Regions:
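Structural preference for solvent-exposed beta-strand-turn elements
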Residues: 1-264
Length: 264
């Protein structure tokens, strides 16, 4: 593998992809980020058996190839590089990183042992990236931080046609936000539970794009997945198992008293 890529593009792509690298990986290869050079692009991928990240950026590829390197180490190196084009080249069991006068050598890990990333489910619709990030920020603060109650650390996503509702509660607080989105099927009706931390990270990281594509696995699928894609970045996550508490009934259908409060 041999290629040249813009320094800022590489640093941003590696930083985003390495977010999914676990701090304490159950197997050594999961500490790596997979790099694949093909055609005119560099594809970066990471996976921790729950959340996957896939990012494709433009690159001048001289020689196709695949290599696996430490994700956190590569991210640290990419941030420290000068503002010049970056050359990546596999040399035996090492990966040489050159940028201006800077030179680094990374040990190549066993790329053949790296697990295959989950397949992105069929697209269900799109939503404005900034609207999604704003709504997730307003709702996720009400999710529990207690990992012994995985249901309450998650955000309930309800889809009914062009309406998308996010809900979260920690038993003391409750937040709900309704959004309008563009479903691929206007008769779509489904629910999903996703960890608040994962949803928050995804929403924040995709705000540079106009629209975010949302995909949910069908009920007949072997595993329950949700996927998000925008601007050459794609991430999938396993959904939380279980039935979310029926918190909607806590909101009255009508009230006799209304008040408007300023936020400034």
């Amino acid at each position: 593998m041999k290629l040249r890529v813009d320094r800022d593009i590489l640093a941003e792509a590696v930083t985003w992809t390495a977010r999914s690298v676990p701090a304490r990986p159950p197997v050594p290869v999961l500490a790596g980020v997979r790099l694949e050079a093909k055609g005119s692009s560099l594809v970066l991928a990471s996976f921790d058996y729950e959340v996957s990240a896939h990012c494709e950026v433009a690159a001048d590829v001289e020689e196709d190839g695949v290599v696996l390197v430490s994700g956190r180490l590569l991210a640290d190196i990419a941030k420290a590089l000068p503002n010049k084009p970056v050359d990546l080249e596999v040399e035996g069991n090492k990966v040489a990183v050159s940028c201006g006068s800077a030179r680094f050598s990374l040990a190549a890990m066993a790329a053949d042992d790296y697990p295959a990333l989950p397949v992105m489910p069929a697209v269900d619709g799109t939503i404005d990236a900034h609207d999604l990030a704003r709504a997730v920020g307003q709702v996720s603060i009400a999710a529990s931080r207690d990992d012994t109650l995985p249901l309450l650390t998650s955000v309930q996503i309800e889809v009914e046609g062009s309406s998308l509702v996010l809900m979260a509660t920690d038993r003391y607080r409750l937040a709900m936000r309704e959004l309008t989105w563009s479903p691929s099927n206007t008769e779509l009706s489904t629910t999903a539970l996703l960890k608040a931390r994962t949803l928050s990270d995804v929403a924040k990281s995709l705000t540079s794009s106009g629209d975010v594509t949302v995909a949910l696995s069908s009920e007949s699928a072997a595993s329950s997945l949700i996927g998000f894609e925008a601007g050459g970045r794609r991430t999938t996550s396993l959904l939380t198992d279980g039935d979310y508490p029926p918190v909607r009934r806590l909101f009255p259908e009508s009230t006799s008293i209304h008040a408007t409060v300023g936020t400034d």
